[in-house]
Swiss-Prot record:
This is Serine--pyruvate aminotransferase. It is an enzyme of class 2 (transferase). Belongs to the class-V pyridoxal-phosphate-dependent aminotransferase family. Its cofactor is pyridoxal 5'-phosphate. InterPro entries: Aminotrans_V_dom, PyrdxlP-dep_Trfase, PyrdxlP-dep_Trfase_major, PyrdxlP-dep_Trfase_small, SP_NH2Trfase/AEP_transaminase. The lineage of its organism: Eukaryota, Amoebozoa, Evosea, Eumycetozoa, Dictyostelia.
């Protein structure tokens, strides 16, 4: 058995094009966030690393607008955070209602059925959101222990109404799990005020960070559910009973109490090697958020979206979601992601290719039921600014004219 050069690929230094990423994610990295990817590597038991962990958890509480002690980053993309919620909160015999009105709310359902519960899918046409009456009807009829929904649906650009949903879940003794991957950091989210029990996001969208690490928060009620399961969490890597021992060993998941001892004296229990430089970059993204102020960040995303709507109208284009509804708790357009109807007779793929080839601008097409019907334009994180929108509208005008659309 000899040494082989069969797969010894001859390569040069990696050189990637510089794109303006105005699709559904990722967004462009903020330079300060990017710089943290080459910060010094330290061991995962180093005191300086523990300090980064603690600061990041506190900054995430600001992001989520929560006092939840169990607020940690998951090692993995947003889908890993989704599966953390599903695998920890569902066990055999549990009845779960999944509200499905888009690609990613359906992904939650597809994931949930693998964990042995009685999973009930409540469908609504893509591009719509669930009214409070519909949600209450599902809770009354099915009596679930968990309700899942997506607040900002990446596939449709729809913002789900949140007003009153948490109160209904408490009324019917049901935990509430909310996907905020395309929304958190771009539009207002109030985990505590909205009585959300499990919430998560990704770093690569409205935080302008690299993918691969995902903020997550659990209420004390969710933690109690996890700690008092009748069966072990079926996913060892994402088991929050184990993850808590590393991130927050001072916290008792079962009763929500915090140990009285000095935190530094409570040993962390190793679980897995966390992606250190991704954690540094997440921390820096959150520091930037604090420096600008959440209210200012939200307003910047809203102002950018409204400027985009005006630009689209000037080209004769229409957002797919007609309702604006600026109040954060109301259903309507998601300011961080806009779906745009592709005009009749226009080749949507050719327009996207023209933007990419001639202007290095990336927007995306629809997925699932919306494939070939819409473009998806993301104004996320640092990319939500007037200069990018003016450049996009000007470039899009050229792309449309080349493809025979009179604008």
């Amino acid at each position: 058995m000899g040494y082989s050069d069969k797969h010894k690929l001859k390569t040069s230094n990696l050189q990637l094009p510089v794109r303006l990423l105005l699709g559904p994610g990722p967004s462009n990295l903020h330079p300060r966030v990017n710089q943290q990817l080459i910060s010094s590597m330290v061991g995962y038991t180093d005191a300086s690393y523990y300090k980064v962990m603690d600061e990041t958890m506190e900054l995430m509480r600001y992001l989520f607008q929560t006092d939840n002690h169990f607020t940690i980053p998951i090692s993995g993309a947003g889908t890993a955070a989704m599966e953390t919620c599903v695998s920890n909160l569902i066990e055999p015999g549990d009845k779960v209602v999944c509200l499905v009105s888009g690609f990613f709310s359906d992904r939650i359902y597809q994931m949930a059925v693998r964990y042995g519960g009685n999973i009930l899918k409540v469908d609504k046409q893509w591009g719509q959101w669930f009214a409070l009456e519909e949600i209450e009807s599902a809770l009354v009829q099915h009596k679930p222990s968990l309700l899942t929904l997506v607040f900002g649906e990446t596939s449709t650009g729809v913002k789900q109404q949140m007003e009153g949903v948490g109160e209904l879940c408490k009324k019917y003794n049901c935990l509430l799990m909310v996907d905020c991957v395309a929304a958190l950091g771009g539009v207002p989210v109030f985990v505590d005020d909205w009585k959300i029990d499990a919430c998560y996001t990704g770093t690569q969208k409205c935080l302008s960070g690299p993918p691969g690490i995902s903020p997550l928060t659990f209420s004390n009620a969710a933690c109690h559910k996890i700690a008092t399961r009748k069966t072990p969490v079926a996913n060892w890597y994402l088991d929050c009973n184990l993850l808590g021992g590393y991130w927050c060993p001072e916290f008792n998941l079962a009763d929500g109490t915090i140990a009285k001892e000095e935190k530094s004296t409570i040993p962390k229990r190793y679980h897995h090697t966390t992606p250190a430089n991704l954690l540094y970059s997440l921390r820096e993204a959150l520091v930037l958020l604090v420096e600008e102020g959440l209210d200012n960040v939200w307003k910047r995303h809203q102002d950018a979206a409204i400027l985009l709507y005006a630009g689209l109208e000037s080209l004769g284009l229409k957002p797919f979601v007609p309702q604006l509804n600026e109040a954060p708790e109301k259903g309507g357009r998601l300011f961080s992601l806009t779906t745009v109807n592709i005009p009749d007779g226009v080749d949507g793929k050719m327009v996207m290719k023209y933007l990419l080839d001639n202007f290095n601008i990336e927007i995306a097409g629809g997925i699932g039921a919306f494939a070939g019907k819409v473009w998806r334009i993301g104004l996320m994180g640092q990319n939500a600014n007037p200069g990018n929108i003016k450049l996009l509208i000007s470039s899009l005008s050229d792309a449309l004219k080349v493809n025979g659309f009179n604008c």
